[in-house]
Amino acid sequence: MNIIYQGISLSDKESIQSIKNITDKDTNYFMIKCASSLDGNIEKEKNFDEYISYAELHSIPYGVYYVTNSTDIKQTEKEADFVFELLKNKKMQFPVYIEQVNTDKTKIKEATDSIVAFCGKAWYNKFYSGFRCTASYLRNNLDFNRLRRYNFWLVCHSDRPGNPVIPFGMWEHTNKCRIDNTLNMFPESYCIQNYPKTIRQNNLNGY
């Protein structure tokens, strides 16, 4: 596995104070949680704007993700519109991901339809997109063959990624990354795709 970039994830679990000493020498990129939706109530992350401002001020590339438990296409499309409105006038060098948290294994088609709908909306709005989940969620809760065309951000906290049923472009390998001069531990991901190059060449994500 050829690791091109290493980056950390940020959400409201962290704070702007926890990253104030981080520079582009400490990490190659941020993955910033922008919103979450539980039962149709989508809310923006409180620290989202501050994280974006910090990344831009310190020239740290970034992508975003949002979390939802929706398996309804119309609801997911509404959430997508909310997310893409947040991303207006921003230049992101990494994709925008949907993380779906649905425990109902009888709704495989609906869950997959929702991810496809989100990624379709993303493409329409000129965003490079994908989905984020564990290998077991991919295998048991989704029709993974329909998702092969999209960027896959694997969550597997281990020293090896295992054998997920489709290739991944990014792998969150730990939630206990320690960065010098900071008190917090962060989720860290390895990126094996040159997303910044692909995004710029195709004029996506604000480019």
Name these PLM-found stretches.
Residues 78-98, 102, 141-168:
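Structural recognition of alpha->loop->beta junctions
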Residues 17, 138-141:
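A generic local structural motif
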Residues 66, 133, 156:
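Short beta-strand/turn micro-motifs composed of small residues
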Residues 1-12, 143-207:
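Functionally critical loop-and-helix segments that line ligand-binding/catalytic clefts
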Residues 71-74, 106-107, 136-139, 173-174, ...:
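Noncatalytic linker/hinge segments flanking ATPase motor cores
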Residues 124-139:
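Aromatic-lined carbohydrate-recognition surfaces of secreted/lumenal glycan-active proteins
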Residues 1-128:
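Substrate-binding cleft of extracellular glycoside hydrolase catalytic domains
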Residues 39, 71, 138, 161, ...:
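Flexible, glycine-rich phosphate/dinucleotide-binding loops
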